[in-house]
Amino acid sequence: MTRRQSLTLLAAPALAASGANTKWPVCMFSKHFQWTGIEQMTALCQQIGFDGIDLTLRPGGHIEPEAVAEELPRALAIIHKAGLATPMVTSHIVDPSTPHAERVMTALKKAGIPRYRWDGFKYDAKRPLPAQLKEIKPRVRDLAAMNKQFGLCAMYHTHSGVNRVGASMWDLYSLLEDFSPDQVSANLDVGHATAEGGFGGWIHSTRLLGPHTRGIALKDFAWKKEGKNWRPGWCAFGQGMVDFKQFLTMIKAAGFQGPIQLHYEYPELGGIDAGKKELTIPQERVVAIFQRDLEACRIVLREAGMA
């Protein structure tokens, strides 16, 4: 073994923790592996071909917040040994008052994981929206200050839907604009963005939040009728209406570097799409579905110059 090879091996854990081996590591959302433990999840993610894992560090997730000091290092040892990155986790943290927030941040700093997905806010449907945003902003300010103290970045996931703060994107921009995106930022989900603005809205949202984005999530959908109502029908990557190539081209042009989370939130997976803790379809079928979408994702990433 040469000296250069030795140094590469010594650097591997740090690279795995930060995702520094690539600008855009494609990560599996561990919510879809809640039916098994860290060891099997890691082995399957390595087999399927993911660059990393977005661990659920929240109540009911792979890591419980109150046990993070003990459980996170054990999980990372397994994941990093397999050569997979952990550039982020998905957390339960809303603001500094969230139970175990400081404990989680301490563990993330110690582990060298720089980013976490930030749990979101909801509107009270009976109150004016501007007044509620004014009340939320100090909570964002305090979280930004806490993240600066720990050297961390919170990424606000953009969900679609009624009473979701951030669904319209402009409200999220108003909450983030006065703070450094290295402390509080967006985790821009293009599937949800397209559901909220399928013609031009998602394009404006990407232009608006692009400079504030530190993580992106990819999922696809097409409108589905349920009774008299139309709802997003989540589907396999490339089978819906999301323009992934245009989105990725735009987000790259905005200077984005960070984790890409691939979400599988459609019923073909028999419940594990929503975090079910047992399989209802054969494991071989699950692996084939995960591989199929990852391969489709990598094709579009190459077309956008991000692979």
Where do the PLM segments sit?
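Histidine-acidic metal/acid-base catalytic patches
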Residues: L7-A11, A20-P25, T36-I48, M169-V184, ...
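Mobile, glycine- and charge-enriched loop segments
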Residues: A20-C27, L76, H80
